[in-house]
A protein has these predicted regions:
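Catalytic core of non-heme Fe(II) oxygenases with the double-stranded beta-helix
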Residues: 1-110
């Protein structure tokens, strides 16, 4: 589980390659990265205390957001996105006991 957040200011791009262990996973439908946007396009991010939120703040924040995409957690799938002030994303809680979410993350930072 990774709560709703945007990435650090100096991160330019994130790339992820997923490696699900299909022998051990019953259902990986909710394992991919979820991406969110504001319901109101005029909403300002500076109204919120933190860009990395605990579960309580994240829950309140999500009242103003809507999920517009969740990447499929499929073998050898590459996804990527550019960091913006509004590039909110999270990983849902995995309810399967002893599950392992394997991926390679490649992040490019600027100074």
């Amino acid at each position: 589980y990774i709560p709703l957040h945007t990435d650090k200011k100096n991160k330019l791009i994130s790339l992820m390659v997923y490696f699900p262990d299909l022998k051990k996973i019953n259902n990986s439908d909710n394992w991919g990265t979820c991406f969110f946007k504001f319901k109101d396009k005029n909403q300002k991010i500076d109204l919120w205390d933190s860009k990395f939120m605990n579960e309580e703040v994240s829950s309140k924040f999500l009242e103003h957001m809507e999920k517009f995409y969740q990447s499929p957690f499929t073998a050898n799938k590459l996804i990527g996105f550019l960091k913006t002030n509004n590039s909110f994303h999270k990983i849902e809680k995995i309810l399967e006991k002893n599950a392992l979410r394997k991926s390679i993350n490649i992040n490019y930072y600027i100074q």
